[in-house]
Amino acid sequence: MDIASFIGLFGGFAIIIFGAVLGGSARGLFHVPSLLITVGGSYLTLFLTYPLSYAVGVFRVIARVFHAADFHEREIVQRLYALAEKSRRTGLLALEEEIQDFDDDFVRTGLRNVVDGVDGDAIKALMESELTHMEDRHNTWISLLNSWAALAPGYGMLGTVMGLIGMLATLEDKSSLGSNMATALITTFYGSLVQNWFITPVATKLQYQHDLEVKSKEMVIEGVLSIQAGDHPRVLAQRLLTYLSPKMRKELEMELIKD
């Protein structure tokens, strides 16, 4: 669970409501027609701009921001270091029994190719190709969210224009002025809210998680190729530690790279 995402989501909403309460306008913030125009309209436009599977699946992707992005870099470095030691002692074929212990298919596939005697350049090409396809998928989802964020204020302005038209058309009916004015103003608020409070932050968080995963997989590629090349375990460790945070790097240096 990513506590920061929950703090950002609910804390931001609470601040908005608290400010509205202090300003005496909290009751006017909820307006169903404006909500339908802004949120519903901008979301349904995604069905026009993206395939059905993406428009429907966007909420599943949004849910990922509430799960902590942990790619187990420390464990991967430790285990690849141990495999490098074992391969130097007993040969690459001895790694076969260790492969299935990895939960990550990306790591397993790379190590399987090493054990099978696949050329290093071929292994690198295969793993980088898989990484590229993953990046393409992730970038499509992030692009979808950015599109939604861009659409929401536009629908907010559309609702504002609709409200103004209704207000101008019924100026003689004083009883409808308040409702039409509310629609005119609140849709702009909803458009800005959807964009700045929710969709754009979610897209940014997913981009951050994506960058972490790419870096993690690049580290795996480096480690697998180092094992395939028969590098000394210390050399492998020094290469992989460059991908880690300074704190984690220092801890693993003390553990793996000994005098």
From Swiss-Prot:
Q: Which family does it belong to?
A: Belongs to the MotA family.
Q: Does the keyword Lipid metabolism apply?
A: no
Q: GO CC terms for this protein?
A: plasma membrane
Q: Which residues lie on this side of the membrane: Cytoplasmic?
A: 205-259
Q: What does this protein do?
A: MotA and MotB comprise the stator element of the flagellar motor complex. Required for rotation of the flagellar motor. Probable transmembrane proton channel.
Can you tell me where the transmembrane regions are?
3-23, 28-48, 148-168, 184-204
Q: Which PANTHER family match?
A: CHEMOTAXIS PROTEIN MOTA, MOTILITY PROTEIN A
Q: Which UniProt keywords apply?
A: Cell inner membrane, Cell membrane, Chemotaxis, Flagellar rotation, Hydrogen ion transport, Ion transport, Membrane, Transmembrane, Transmembrane helix, Transport
| Annotated membrane topology | Multi-pass membrane protein
Q: Name one GO biological process term.
A: bacterial-type flagellum-dependent swarming motility
| Originating organism | Treponema pallidum (strain Nichols)
Q: Does the keyword Ribonucleoprotein apply?
A: no
Protein name per its UniProtKB record: Motility protein A
Q: How does it assemble?
A: Each stator complex is composed of 4 MotA and 2 MotB subunits. 2 A subunits and 1 B subunit are thought to form a single ion channel, so that each stator complex contains two channels.
